């Protein structure tokens, strides 16, 4: 089966207007899935969403929401290490995910803390996410942990290596916790895509893409996309792919190149 592409409605189809209108525009362009950032928009650059209107648009068009972000953005490692708001809002996020039919919530690591060893912080993340998974047990919502690049977009973030996301996922050891592999972040960090995907294996539960350099649409940078999707397919991943990029042209037109490649990957 061809890969199912999910445009990020924070960045794509903004020409259509509000988020629910972007869902309709994506569907009109032939997409059957979309993704988004935080549902309530408490963390910039996400903005608040009319959840009932968004649900109506998803239902009306038969569009699948593939992923949303956890809220609020949490600095897990920075003293005093109070995670209560994260756990409280996690339940709210799961309720919204259920309402919108979204099977995944994206989580992160926050900023690393210079006063603690890296390994200690990774092990703390395991405990934090074990508790999170236990809290939402029975929800059928999967938490996916994203490593991000620190060279360009997220300086100071603790998790900047796919291998460390995989380490945390192995430690959590749950079918409802896995790795979000972002090919853009991985490439910017200089990782070997094939090696990282092979090492992470079936821990990869979601994928996002953008070209590099620039974080524009596939075809705007230097990534060899036929090769990249071939590597992804060879790794065994057959789930949806989020299109999380900043388009340099009209949204639908910006998707044409990667849609052609994904159709035969």
What residues fall within each predicted segment?
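N-terminal pre-domain/capping segments
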Residues: 1-103, 174, 246, 252-265
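Generic enzyme active-site microenvironment
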Residues: 33, 144-145, 180-183, 187, ...
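Active-site acidic/histidine proton-transfer and metal-coordination neighborhood
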Residues: 57-60, 76-178
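Gly/Pro-rich active-site loop or hairpin
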Residues: 15-16, 20-23, 76-81, 155-162, ...
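Conserved beta-strand positions in the central sheet of alpha/beta enzyme cores
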Residues: 35, 67, 106, 144, ...
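Active-site-proximal loop/turn and secondary-structure-junction residues that shape catalytic pockets
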Residues: 11-13, 38-40, 71-74, 109-113, ...
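Catalytic-core regions built around general acid/base machinery
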Residues: 50-60, 128-136, 196-199, 227-231
């Amino acid at each position: 089966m061809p890969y199912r592409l999910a445009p990020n409605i924070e960045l794509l189809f903004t020409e259509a207007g509000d988020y629910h209108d972007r869902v309709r525009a994506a569907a009109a362009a032939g997409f059957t899935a979309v993704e988004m950032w935080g549902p309530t928009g408490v963390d910039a650059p996400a903005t608040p969403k009319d959840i009932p209107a968004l649900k109506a648009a998803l239902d009306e068009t038969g569009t699948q929401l593939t992923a949303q972000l956890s809220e609020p953005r949490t600095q897990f490692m920075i003293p005093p290490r109070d995670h209560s708001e994260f756990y409280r809002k996690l339940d709210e996020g799961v309720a919204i995910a259920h309402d919108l039919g979204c099977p995944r919530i994206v989580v992160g690591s926050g900023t690393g803390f210079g006063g603690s060893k890296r390994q200690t912080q990774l092990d703390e993340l395991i405990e934090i996410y074990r508790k999170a998974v236990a809290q939402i047990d029975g929800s059928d919502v999967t938490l996916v942990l994203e490593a991000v690049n620190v060279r360009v977009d997220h300086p100071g973030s603790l998790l900047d290596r796919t291998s460390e996301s995989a380490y945390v996922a192995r430690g959590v050891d749950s079918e409802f916790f896995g790795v979000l592999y972002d090919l853009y972040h991985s490439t910017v960090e200089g990782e070997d895509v094939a090696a990282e995907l092979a090492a992470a294996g079936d821990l990869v539960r979601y994928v996002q893409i953008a070209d590099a350099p620039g974080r524009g649409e596939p075809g705007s940078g230097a990534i060899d996309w036929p090769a990249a999707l071939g590597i992804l397919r060879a790794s065994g991943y057959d789930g949806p792919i989020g299109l999380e990029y900043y388009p340099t042209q009209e949204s639908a037109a910006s998707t044409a190149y990667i849609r052609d490649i994904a159709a035969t990957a």
